């Protein structure tokens, strides 16, 4: 049976939502620790509720009054902020009444319809840019309801198949803080794709879609290295860290003189070294590398074709990736989280960029340079004792050139229901693109255009005008010389 783990802070948040608004709802951000266990990372109340209804204490809001469009919008926006190891795993409802935790009530039946509506909206929204993951799409979700009247919690597993069904699942509020291990890598883009659209005006969004498909294909065929070495997929992250620790311990010499150096002291001395190398996890970072295969290995020789194309799409840049894993995650899951984070970040940048386009069509004769937003990171503020140990969990947002961190503050409040300090936002993880690179591209394009004109059989307009003026000047000079010669001969 599937189990959901929550912290005491989550219980206090549910109680707070019911006390302040009498009826609140929102999303659940979680992490898949293993096949049967999920960890709740964050609960975020939906802030797009009707303000007029909130002011009316006589109005009794129910699950049927929930705006599925607003909740789906929050779901999608939060998914863009989550690292690759986290997902929106469900929704929660917090109320002062007890019928929200009664399986026989009408509220429980309305919850099933709400999930069905939201899932349909999510599928429709994702159809244009594909899924956010390199794995299969998620179909099981969590429904969590809290009643302030009797301090009771109801937790169910919702499966979209077979018309949508609720099944039992366990939940526990744990006192022990959750432990997180941070992994970080940089993914370098430098690839050229052909534009096969033969029309004069090309849809740039369609070309971005082709780019996403290509990157996803490369990520699926890639290999992930941890600390510059290949690690077996079958072991878990905790065993990998222990193995690295044991390996370093064996390198420490054991002194037999003086009676002060022992195996225990060697283990203690090795911990700072492990921490400095980013091996033991905790507050340190494990460095990862995504290695792509050779292009010739991605396709068979029979798949190679010679085709005409109308232009090229050049991808250039670096994506900074940060994921946060549970010690019991398998290495296979860790690698998948890193790949998902890169793909999710790329899709999010493209979506944010395309949302700001006034005209998605460009001519295939022009040099079109796109600068998607860069990624910035922020930590969730905690009230009271921290609900986690080890690495501090971070979410991300995207800023265009010239935008201030205050944009992130507003987005975090609206989507994740957290109050951020602009000074705590990490904006240096990804730098701004170098303008000289764009200028060089433009100069190269100009040179290509000039060379095309030089090969023409027609003379340049500037050269024709010069020859015309020289001809007139020579004619005037000959005319003046003739007149002068005529006067000289006439005087004689």
From Swiss-Prot:
Belongs to the ODR-4 family. Pfam families: ODR4-like. It is a single-pass membrane protein. One of its GO terms (cellular component) is membrane. Disulfide bonds: none annotated. May play a role in the trafficking of a subset of G-protein coupled receptors. One of its GO terms (biological process) is protein localization. The chain crosses the membrane at residues 469-489. Keywords: Membrane, Transmembrane, Transmembrane helix. This is Protein odr-4 homolog. It is found in: Membrane. Signal peptide: none annotated. Residues 254-268 have a biased composition (Low complexity). InterPro entries: ODR-4-like (IPR029454). Residues 251-270 are annotated as: Disordered.
